[in-house]
Structure formats: structure tokens, C-alpha cells
Design a protein with these regions (language model features):
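A noncatalytic interaction/capping subdomain that flanks phosphate/NTP-handling catalytic cores
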Residues: 1-124, 134-145, 151-256
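Hydrophobic positions on the alpha1 helix immediately C-terminal to the Walker A/P-loop
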Residues: 131
Length: 256
């Protein structure tokens, strides 16, 4: 049975479409045609498992949230367009609903080689994008599964990295799903070195970089999903911006 997630607005049919993310078909009732274009690589005709309806009230709320976030980060508040904010509302709705379907939204750059995905994560400005480009330029056969916000699908004992339309400023990404072979926490350093770390050592970063539900009732589900990342090999990489950094992380994860 479909479950609707909707506010109180009525929408025109021309802005209705379906997308498939992490194997889940979703019906979207959008306000702007640009949102369908934003999701163009994920469109589907499959019957949806749930629906999302976006309203101006939700867009206004997320605008205020974005302003607060900018101010807290010491940045001048940006004049975000309603079209852009609608994509964030959609992401928030989907990420919350996905928790009950064993899918977690994660902030990081997922690169792929040899049909396996490796997820790099770090605080903003540390160099996820730079390190991703080093892999593209140095590791043969590498491509980017998602450059900013992949979904992580938990299925039985396995974890899969899944593409999404939210691919970051560079637009790196593909609509595919691959086994997640490692999560790597990036730190700046003068030399390049990588080490395996425990789930407890990685926990503070995993908490910070994963999507937390807006509803308290879903927090237990979120924490249970997060704990399942303990089954994924975890690493800490100290790196600079030289080509060697890509080889150190590749050999430290893919060749183990």
C-alpha cells in the first residue's frame, strides 16, 4: 500500500513524476518543473511505494533552516531560490522515509572501481572533492558513484552505496548501486598514510555525516542502521593533495 507524505497544497499534474532511488520507486508532487529535470536520471514508470508532496510552507521552513545554518557557520546567508530549496525538501522527506526501509543518507563522496564503492567523508573544506579527483586521475577504471550524498542500503549482511540526484557542485555521479567496500575518514596531513580504525573510533564522524530524522520516533531506527556500518571496513586517511594520496588510499583499502 502506498503511504502519502504530504502537506496541504494542491498541485498541477504537470509537476508530478516518479523516481527510483536505492531501489525504491517514489511518486513526487512538485511545485517546479525544474525538480523533475533535477531528477531526470532517476525517473521511472514503476508503481510508487510512497508519495511526497512539496508545499511552499515546507520550502519556507527549509529556507529559515538554511539561513540559521549559514549564520552558525560564520557565513553570510545565501539567497537560495525556491527551485533549489524544493530539491532539499524532497531530499529531507525521502531520507526520513527511507530509514524505515533500511536506507541511510550519508554525506560523502563515493568512488567506484572494480565494481566496488569506497566512501570518503570529512568535514567541509578538508578535501573530499580533491581526493575524489585524484582517484579519477590516477586509479584506472575509477568513476564517481555519487559526489556528495549517496544513499546506503542495508540488505541482509551487506551494505550498498546508491546513487542519487544530489551529487554536489561538480555533478559527479551515476544511477547505480554497488557493494560498499570501505568508508574512509579524510584528514589533512603533510604525508600520506592510512590505517584501519574501529567503529567506535569512527562513530563521531559517522554521526555527524549521516542524516538524522526530523522525528524523534525514528531516532532508534536511525541509530540501529548506523550501528550496522560496523560491518563495513573503516579507515582513517591522512593525506595531502599529491597524486600519491590516491595510491595510498587505494592500496590501503582495495588491495587488502
Amino acid at each position: 500500500m502506498k503511504r502519502a507524505i504530504r502537506d496541504d497544497a494542491s498541485l498541477t499534474a504537470e509537476n508530478e513524476f516518479s523516481i527510483k532511488l536505492a531501489g525504491i520507486p517514489i511518486r513526487v508532487h512538485a511545485l517546479f518543473r525544474s525538480t523533475k529535470e533535477f531528477c531526470r536520471y532517476y525517473l521511472t514508470e514503476e508503481p510508487p511505494l510512497f508519495e511526497v508532496t512539496i508545499t511552499m510552507e515546507r520550502i519556507k521552513k527549509i529556507r529559515m533552516d538554511a539561513i540559521v545554518c549559514d549564520l552558525q557557520g560564520g557565513r553570510k546567508p545565501q539567497n537560495y531560490t525556491d527551485n533549489y530549496l524544493e530539491t532539499l525538501v524532497l531530499l529531507e522527506f525521502v531520507a526520513d522515509e527511507f530509514l524505515s526501509r533500511n536506507i541511510l543518507l550519508f554525506h560523502g563522496s563515493a568512488v567506484a572501481v572494480d565494481r566496488k564503492a569506497y566512501l570518503f567523508t570529512a568535514k567541509s573544506g578538508v578535501g573530499k572533492t580533491t581526493h575524489t579527483k585524484l582517484w579519477l586521475n590516477n586509479i584506472p577504471g575509477t568513476h564517481v558513484l555519487n559526489g556528495d550524498k549517496p544513499f546506503l542500503l542495508f540488505h541482509e549482511d551487506d551494505v550498498y552505496a546508491c546513487g542519487s540526484p544530489w551529487r554536489g557542485k561538480e555533478g559527479f555521479g551515476r544511477n547505480e548501486m554497488l557493494p560498499l567496500a570501505g568508508i574512509c575518514l579524510l584528514e589533512r596531513d603533510n604525508s600520506n598514510h592510512i590505517e584501519s580504525i574501529s567503529y567506535q573510533e569512527a562513530l563521531s564522524v559517522l554521526l555527524f555525516q549521516s542524516h538524522k530524522p526530523a522525528q524523534d520516533a525514528r531516532m532508534v531506527t536511525y541509530l540501529k542502521l548506523l550501528s550496522r556500518l560496523s560491518s563495513v571496513p573503516l579507515y582513517r586517511l591522512g593525506c595531502n593533495m599529491e597524486n600519491e594520496a590516491a595510491w595510498v588510499s587505494y592500496k590501503g583499502m582495495a588491495e587488502r
